[in-house]
Amino acid sequence: MEKDGLPTYAAAANQPASQPRRRFRKSRSLKVIAVACLVYLAYAQWHQRSIAPYRTTTLSLERLQADLATCAKLQHKPQDPAGQRARNGRYIEGHKPTLIKNATVWVGEPAAGTSAEDAHAGKGYSWVQSDVFLEHGLIKSVGANIATDSLPSDVQVYDAQGRPLTAGIVDMHSHAGVNPLPQLRGNEDTNEMSADITPYVRSIDGLDPLDHQIQVIKSGGVTTSLVLPGSGNNIGGEAFVIKHAVGRPDGRLEVSAADMLADPDRSWRYIKMACGENPKRVYGKAGEHGPTSRMGESWEFRHAFEQAAALVREQDDWCAAAQAGGVDAVETYLPQDLRWETLGAVLRGQVHVNAHCYTVPDLEAFVDHTNEFKFPIRAFHHAHETYIVPEILKRAWGGRPPAAALFATNMDYKSEAYRGSERAGAILHDAGITPVYVSDNPVLNAQHVVYEAAKARGHGLPYHAALAGVTSAPAELLGLGERIGKVKPGYDGDVVVWDSDPLSVGAAPAQVWIDGTAQYGEPFLLNKTWSVPSVDPSVDALLTAPSEEVTLDSASANIVFTNITTTLHPSFPPAALSPGSSAPNVLIITAGAITCLGPCLPHLPHVLHTHTTIPLGRFGGTFTPALTALGSALGLSEIAAEPSTRDGVNTPTSPFARAVDGLLATGSKQLAAARRHGVARAVAAPLGARGVGVGFWVAGEGEGEEGGEVWGEEVSVHYALGRGAKEPSLSAAVGELRGRLLEAVEGLNGTGKETETVVGRYDEQAFLRRVVGEGLALVVHVDSADTIKALLRVKGEVEDALADVGDALAGVDGDEGKANGTRRIRLVLVGAAESHLLARDLAAAGVGVVLAPLLQYSQHWDQRRSLTGAPLTNGTAIDALLDAGVDVAIGASPSETWEAGWLSGGWVE
């Protein structure tokens, strides 16, 4: 068979019938290619989206860029602002420079080359004779004999006349401005009570620059304060550091909280937290949200930090993505939550934490929180038990133990303060913990916060550490240690010239400068003599060593006190002492009676063999009468905030009580403290100041015996006519007292003695009849000058009624109340903040005054006209009262002996 019949491949390809098939195949290939391209594009887009998330067009590029800039702020690590500057950021153009000549300067740091160990011990510190030049809001130079011809022609010269000059006082716990004085409901902004955790509130938003207390505080040399929210909740909010210069009179251009900021750049932020009793008391109520125990408080803290930590993580993740790939790399805005912003800054190390914590459990729990969430704490405030557990403080996160911001002697007012010690500062200093001293204004008047440091020194804290505790130490804790707290070139021009050693009792500023501007045009100045105090650590140790209490049976006590240097006893004037050193002065007590004061040379050979000798050391001692405490709850209350430790409070509707029936004197820490401070006797009124006062001995007669022995069961009749008496009104309370006194006058019989039944022996009228008929003291607790004026009218009306009794009172026992043949009731005012306004009237009426406390301030409305003393006022209430001839005493306080010292410290001539 031939192969010609078979088709060939070439022939088949050339046949015309095959052309349409060829066109079809080419079209399909193009489609395949197109599909492949589409697949590739889809894949590329998918792949691109897997690399960088797709950003929707709804996000604002401008806002994303702002968020990216915020990342830098979040990651910023603050540093203490440097001191060396051309001018202070708070300086106001046009203020003249000032040269302070002839000052005795406390620089605030040891001499160059002093080792850290020696500096801690107090070596290298000294007062130096120097001039200080202030310009552009700064300390420009410190040195001897600065020549005025080297200074600007418009320089102002202030002659310090050798007086001491220190840096301005720094109080790192104050509520000035947010708790203005006098306290009123409408201006109280210390605590935000809407929740237990309020880190988002700010003290500056409630700060009133017109709070007069800001000026009063400055008059004590305080130039800078940390204004904190209160301690009513566990996290109270953000705090701010202010200077005490407000408006044009103080050299400022405006009246505003912003203008008061100590560091306008706000290098650091601050926050207040609190542990313990306060949050439990405020929020610990059944059925309501809030902690009822310290366990609950720890949960509140940890839960809050957990929320803040979550926000920080989200922000860090967002910032990492945006910083790596730009704003196109993020799909959302930066996570932000104003509620947790401040706590987030705490966890980032941008906020100095200050925590109100008293007790060992509180301190230990809070230290645990710092380690769990990795944030530092700057200081524990109040901190009454820190001296017991310094090792716990040293476990706080960050490697730097927190400081302890303390009161010197204000303690025992509630359970968590009951273990406090007057030597806490000295103990903490020895343990390597920094003690600083604060006011908690208005709890204590910050005008006298330097006085807290003085008391700490008296209880063993070395001189340099005590003065640092209100200057350089708080400045450093605030992160402003190169700006304030020392007298060095480059520091802010915040300095104080004092009328005496600032750590002496009664010291007051002669002038205060803030940012180089003098704050007083014509300050009142107390003329005092002073000598440069020794700051040698060995001498300081002798001066502040704790004294041993000596208790001997008064009936058989045979004692010789050697080296008496001063006497303030009215029966033993200074003339009894020998001024020479060849014959040291001694005080001889034989069988419990004083037998000699002075050199006593004829007595010494005998008594040195028969008496116990008690040397008073190298610096000697002062002989005073024992003190009598009046005006406190001593003997009736152990812990003010714990009802179970108190006798209880009497109200206007309570039965008339006798304090002797509620005396709580056995095993009292309060009585022991009073005894250590020289108090021998006390007069206590029923709590609420309505009833009959009792007189008792603070110490027992024999060694180791408890106090509380009564020397007078019924020594006075007490009423209160202050804020608590306005039920229903103060006028009604005054009228009721008038009526009862007049009723008592009518109850006298012809002999002037009270008519009573056995049952009525202890009722109110019986005691008031003794007031009007026998001279029993009527003690009224009152502050307002208006109420005092009303009392003077009542006194006159009652005495007129007594005059009507006429001869019926002739020969009555107890003639102490008679004057010029007219019976007078013995009226004594306690508190008496505004008594100086009626000094002459009080003297004419024969009214005695017990100032309690001695140094009053306008804490309440009826104290608003108190005199604060130099440099603001020419004296205090006691000056006006003594000048008018009023009999004046000082009321009991936690530091009664220190307050008595103000009288000999130059505040009263």
Question: Would you name each region that the model predicts?
Answer:
Residues 1-25:
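Short, low-complexity, Lys/Arg-enriched N-terminal segments of secretory-pathway carbohydrate enzymes
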Residues 21-25, 42-76, 86-89, 94, ...:
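His/Asp/Glu-enriched, well-ordered alpha-helical/loop segment
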Residues 26-36, 46-47, 213, 218-377, ...:
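Polyanionic/metal-chelating signatures
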Residues 46, 51, 70-74, 80-85, ...:
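Histidine-rich, glycine-flanked metal-binding segment
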Residues 103, 132, 137, 162, ...:
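Divalent metal-coordination and catalytic microenvironments
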Residues 120-121, 488-533, 560, 568, ...:
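C-terminal cap of metal-dependent C-N hydrolases
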Residues 170-172, 225, 271, 353-355, ...:
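Hydrophobic faces of well-ordered beta-strands that scaffold small-molecule active sites
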